[in-house]
Every structure is written in C-alpha cells, then in structure tokens.
Amino acid sequence: MGGVLTDRFSRQASLVPREKLIETTFTVVGVGAIGRQVALQLASIGVYKLRLIDFDIVDMTNVTTQGYTAKSIGKQKVSACADDILSIDASIDVQPIADRFRPIQAAHGVTICCVDKISARAAIWRACKGKCDLWIDGRMLGEVIRVLVADTCPSHSHYESTLFAQSEAHSGSCTSKSTIYTASIAAGLMTHQISRWLRGLPIDADIMFNLLASEIVVV
C-alpha cells in the first residue's frame, strides 16, 4: 500500500484540469437516474459550483432505479441529491432548485440535460444554446444509451436534428425502462466528455451504446 495522500485529486490531476474545473459552473437539469449519477461524479472529481434543477420528489422506485436512499423517500430530489453531494465534499457550492427549468435559469458553463421528454429537452436547449459553453444530453431506454454533446455551431446543428417530435420518440416509461447500472454507465460517458472539454480535446457529438448487443457507435 502506498503512502498517505494529502490531496484527494492527485490521482486524476493529469486527466481533470483542477483550475478550469473550479472556475466552471455546472448545471444538472433533472436529477433522476442519469442526472443524479452525473451530479455525484462531478462532486467526486471536484467541481466547485453545482446547480441542481428538478421539481420531482423521491419515491420508492427511485431507490432501485436512481440510487436514492430509503430515508430520502418523500424529499425533494434536489435536496436529497444535494445532501449526497455535500457528504462527498462539504466545500462544494451546491444550489438545489426545486422547480421546473425556467429560461431565466440558463447560465454560462456546462449544462447537463437529463430530463425525460424530447419536448422538454427542446425547450431547455432553446434557452441555453446561446449561453452555455458546453451542452450534454443523456438519454436512456432500457439498456440503450445515447449521449449527445454540443459546443460549437456544427455540433449545435447535429444536436438540433435529434429533437424530433415527441410522438416519434421511443415508447416506454421511465419506471419500466430504467436501471441504475445503465444510468451509471451513461453518466460516466457524459463525465468523460466533460473531462475532454476541460482539457481542450475534441468532444464526441453523438455516442450510441447498446449494452445488450455490446455495440457502440460514435459520431
């Protein structure tokens, strides 16, 4: 076993630029299955300012599919998630907003969209695309993941092409088509794209990962 580490970030120093991480504001819209996992990963890698936006309340199924604890049942998701974040690092400036996303909440920095409906994604995107520096959208249906990233005009155009009508979206409710392990993998892919962006590396605009078929397609 190695010696005692006095800096908890030392083992990721070459992969996650600490200074840029500290100066960037991160906003997670929707702290359900994917959003909660992303928020916890961001806390672990050392973000300084983190906003959580969600109007929903933790219920029994969220313990299984989203990783909330039994004692959080009945609490606002943003409050429960904020508590978990502060248990990782009490110095994080975490702002829980128990509400639906409002255009006034659009901000510079990184916006991570983890809402259920295509129509909601489109509305949030319209409010954020002229303000945020990096946009990441995580989607999941059963064991199929899609991660979309936009940081430049070409990637903006590609992202907007995925905002099809809600009637064209895959059917299936978030309760019947969600697993914690798929959400955790999706969150890891999204956090990796944030790490690439922080390092000035090219982002992947579109990642499709079918876990059951063990197939991944990157655009």
Model-based region annotation:
Residues M1-V219:
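Adenine nucleotide-associated cytosolic modules
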